Amino acid sequence: MASDDWRLLLKDYLLPFAFGDRRYRDLGDDVLEIGPGPGLTTDLIRGGLVNLTAIELDPDLASALSDRMRGTNVDVVEGDGTAMPFESARFTGAMTFTMFHHVPTVELQDQLLGEIFRVLQPGGLLVASDSVASEDLAALHIDDIYNPMDPATLSDRLGTIGFAEIEIETNSLGWRCQARRRP
């Protein structure tokens, strides 16, 4: 999908679905975005936040996003979400969009969720969304990792890690999750 089409889909559909009745500011003043890729969601959300830190695994994407965000409220860190270089309980909120299906195994997905839990402050909010498994999306990922997360298992996985107030919703295209780190 072309970047302009994807940006419109993010703005008009994906982000409103992911946040539901919440606003970006509900994430607090020090927010973490995991896996921003080229930063399309970063562009759309950063204006509604005080401080945003984005952690991106791909060095080229992290560098390009860092250059583009210089002088803004966004700090870009090149790093692995399964082993984040942040102190525990640093962030008031965390978010990730259309990224989990790029994590190669269920175990690494759970490790990533555990790291998000670790770096969230007690009571911190996680907002996440991704696509549901489909043959069409699998075809788009022929030369890429495609390991969609089953939303039917997500509540138990989050609860095991320590999240509470877990809300999961699905539709024909994807799922959204909102959860809080237990105080």
Enumerate the language-model features and the residues they cover.
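Short catalytic micro-motifs in class I SAM-dependent methyltransferases
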Residues: 98-102
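A conserved beta-strand element that flanks and buttresses the S-adenosyl-L-methionine
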Residues: 95
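C-terminal alpha-helical "lid/dimerization" subdomain adjacent to the S-adenosyl-L-methionine
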Residues: 125-178
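Conserved alpha-helix/loop element of class I SAM-dependent methyltransferases that forms part
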Residues: 9-29
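A short glycine-rich, Lys/Arg-flanked "PGG" loop and its adjoining helix->strand segment in the class I
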Residues: 110-122
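Class I SAM-dependent methyltransferase SAM/SAH-binding core
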Residues: 32, 37-83
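Class I SAM-dependent transferase core
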Residues: 1-11
